[in-house]
Amino acid sequence: MQWTSLLLLAGLFSLSQAQYEDDPHWWFHYLRSQQSTYYDPYDPYPYETYEPYPYGVDEGPAYTYGSPSPPDPRDCPQECDCPPNFPTAMYCDNRNLKYLPFVPSRMKYVYFQNNQITSIQEGVFDNATGLLWIALHGNQITSDKVGRKVFSKLRHLERLYLDHNNLTRMPGPLPRSLRELHLDHNQISRVPNNALEGLENLTALYLQHNEIQEVGSSMRGLRSLILLDLSYNHLRKVPDGLPSALEQLYMEHNNVYTVPDSYFRGAPKLLYVRLSHNSLTNNGLASNTFNSSSLLELDLSYNQLQKIPPVNTNLENLYLQGNRINEFSISSFCTVVDVVNFSKLQVLRLDGNEIKRSAMPADAPLCLRLASLIEI
């Protein structure tokens, strides 16, 4: 029964190929005819309908009937709001504050974003050691005015928002309980090897839009890290080792020119890698660099590649637009081409290269039979 199905599949393929043998581009016409939605060829991620980095801050647990009586609102600083229906939340955002006010001990969620705060003085949170979230993004905080131990007593802190400030170095020490750390849109130039030491519970680290030139081995101890964003920096090298739990790595818009052989094997759960707008060449990539069975999406667009690097057959989305690729090698996708061995690739972007449609091998439709979008 199995051989009958295989022979039937092969026969259908031969029949389809013979039917369109007068049109060398029949496969492209077929793929376009199957697209049911509008496609923008300049959109690097045409199927991505969500914001890559959703930015929302919860408002904390609400007071419900039957709970203990709400606390006395008189302990709330006059510069802020402490609504009775959110008894553990203090809202001090968008008030032109230049300093951090007193924080009552009952607070777990404090919001100081979008003010003119320049410093985080030592001891400012010592009265509220049960804090879970601190939002300080969108201020004018500088590194020399952040108390060195200002966060050390917050043993329950889970989320810290310090993005969109004027920080030039990593804050610390930070509590081990931290799960999300937002330091993007600052002026940080390096990440010392011990800057993130002990943060074994950290799942998301946002360092995009800084001036980072080196991260060294600072990421190795982050055994729970799932998302790492280092995009829009000045990195010339990838980090020395990746956390084993990592699923999303964003390093677009840097100066990376090489990726070591088998680099991603240390992150067996990695799903998404974005290395667009770097300085990658084929000489800087080994043959097994991207042959990771877990990868679903790989973005190498706008680099200096001349050949398609070999990828694993499990890859679903490959973005190579804006390079210097001048040949189409089917072996980059399928080491063996037949009716039972094929790539799972669905989206392939090759537009903006030096390759022509006529370079497409005759056996490409058999290898890339699951593709729904191919742009050349």
From Swiss-Prot:
Annotated positions of the Pyrrolidone carboxylic acid modification: Q19
Region forming the signal peptide: 1-18
Gene3D superfamilies attached to this UniProt entry: Ribonuclease Inhibitor
GO biological process, one term: transforming growth factor beta receptor complex assembly
Coiled coil ranges: none
InterPro entries for this protein: Leu-rich_rpt, Leu-rich_rpt_typical-subtyp, LRR_dom_sf, LRRNT, SLRP
Disulphide bond pairs: C334-C367
Site (Not sulfated) location in chain: Y63, Y65
Domain LRRNT, residue spans: 67-105
Keywords: Disulfide bond, Extracellular matrix, Glycoprotein, Leucine-rich repeat, Proteoglycan, Pyrrolidone carboxylic acid, Repeat, Secreted, Signal, Sulfation
Modified residues annotated as Sulfotyrosine in this record: Y20, Y38, Y39, Y45, Y47, Y53, Y55
Top-rank taxon, per record: Eukaryota
SUPFAM superfamilies reported for this sequence: L domain-like
Glycosylation sites: N127, N166, N201, N291, N341
Similarity remark: Belongs to the small leucine-rich proteoglycan (SLRP) family. SLRP class II subfamily.
Chain's role: Affects the rate of fibrils formation. May have a primary role in collagen fibrillogenesis.
Subunit and partners: Binds to type I and type II collagen.
Protein name: Fibromodulin
